[in-house]
Amino acid sequence: MEGFMQAPEVKVVSDQGSGRAFVVVFDDSAYLPLVRSIGEAIAKSARAVVIQVDQVNGESWVGLVDALSSALTELKVRQASFVGVAAGATLVQDLALSNPKIVRTLVIIDASLRPHPSRFERVLDAIEARLPFGLPLRLGSKSFNVRAFAHRLRCPMLLVSTRRASPFVCRELQALGEVAPTAWHVEVKSDDFSVESSALADYMLAFQDTPAKCPQKNLQEAV
């Protein structure tokens, strides 16, 4: 039917464990084995909700945030540590801005500043990076760029790069860490899948106890 738009899809992959909640959000099926393994590890000591969403891009992210918020209400998640994987990071970062009470901590894995940025957006971001902080260009793009709002992200945020991250994504994570007031950065790049997923889960569980009002900066570690 002409003009018909399919509602954005949010799928609960798993909901395991009990206690304090972790919510893992991703869109790329290539990460499915990793997030399943992380969810299983976290569920041994906390509640782990793994959610897959439709592809996040400059147009879809607004509807997906609304759909994710509705899903969290149905799941009775009132506060959680959120994990945004690749473009899924856009959704949890927006939640931290629009509904900060629900976000205890943020873990951002292999994410660029925008979801799936086009070549034009990459050029635009390079220009914006040279402007005074907080003055992004306004060229009609509806895409979410977390750099413009990083100074408002007050919850503790752990930035993680894995072996899957491209050099571009690694640079983007570093750039976010430089402007976000409460950010750490770690690398987990083991080729052993079990070591990698276990290390990620351990980081997430430990990071949940970070004081919410205790700004820190860029602790560099690697696994």
Regions found by a protein language model. Give the residues of each.
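Hydrophobic, aromatic-rich cap/lid helix
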Residues: 2, 120-148
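Conserved HGGG/HGGXW glycine-rich cap/lid loop of the alpha/beta-hydrolase fold
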Residues: 6, 10-58
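Active-site loop/oxyanion-hole signature of alpha/beta-hydrolase fold enzymes
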Residues: 40, 49-81
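Flexible "cap/lid" loop of the alpha/beta hydrolase fold
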Residues: 97, 106-130
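Short beta-strand/loop motif that positions the catalytic acidic residue
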Residues: 153, 159-161
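Conserved alpha/beta-hydrolase "acid-adjacent" motif
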Residues: 166-172
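Catalytic active-site module of serine/aspartate enzymes centered on a nucleophile-bearing elbow/loop
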Residues: 183-223
